[in-house]
A protein has these predicted regions:
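Flavin-dependent oxidoreductase catalytic cores
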Residues: 1-206
Length: 206
């Protein structure tokens, strides 16, 4: 889990000082980091934060604490990208695999919960298991999120957005969520992620 999220989750944050305990203490360090960023970039620069609205693990951050944290950070952040999962549990670490039980748009429900609960005007974004334009449009049309983000879909097909805009969804080379791009982005592989469906992401045979 990344540094800021490790403070926000009660699973990873076991501190007993002012940076641990209740949600406000756990959000103290992230708020300090975001405030310093805001001070440096000014009010005219958009700041987006990736945020676990659910850890998918017993004892993880609650929906109530997640919403309260977003409101607490709302004066120093513009967009919250709602994701989920945890490396502390094998199931929670593989929830985005295509063969897993969670399906597509797996974090849209938590983004929707954040939109319902927060009192601030922070833009809520969802990410995870959204690899078709129609699904992205559905999530937005149903009001589950203000924005939709994706990453691996663009590794599979860098022209994803262009094809979607041209209404050629059938030509999109879909991400199959096999995680090869994640398991090969290591120094041993020259820091170049591979892709099962995109041969351009594979080093040429010598």
């Amino acid at each position: 889990d990344w540094l800021i999220q490790s403070f926000l989750s009660p699973i990873s944050n076991q501190r007993t000082d002012q940076y641990g305990g209740n949600w406000e203490n756990r959000a103290r360090f992230p708020k300090m980091v975001l405030q310093r960023i805001r001070d440096k970039v000014g009010e005219n620069t958009i700041i987006e934060m990736r945020f676990n609205a659910c850890d998918y693990v017993k004892g993880g951050i609650s929906i109530e604490d997640a919403a309260a944290t977003i409101d607490y950070l709302s004066d120093v952040v513009d967009i919250i990208q709602c994701t989920g999962g945890s490396m502390d549990d094998p199931y929670a670490d593989v929830f985005s695999i295509s063969l897993g039980p969670m399906g597509h748009a797996i974090n849209a429900w938590s983004a929707e919960e954040m939109k319902k609960r927060i009192k601030s005007n922070v833009i809520i974004e969802t990410v995870g298991g959204i690899n078709e334009p129609a699904l992205a449009e559905q999530v937005l049309a149903e009001g589950k999120a203000d924005l939709v983000a994706m990453a691996r879909s663009f590794i599979a097909d860098p022209d994803w957005a262009r094809k979607a805009k041209a209404n050629h969804a059938e030509d999109i080379r879909p991400c199959i969520r096999c995680r090869r791009c994640l398991t090969t982005s290591t120094p041993e592989f020259c820091n170049r992620s591979r892709c099962t469906v995109n041969p351009a992401r594979t080093l040429p045979v010598k």
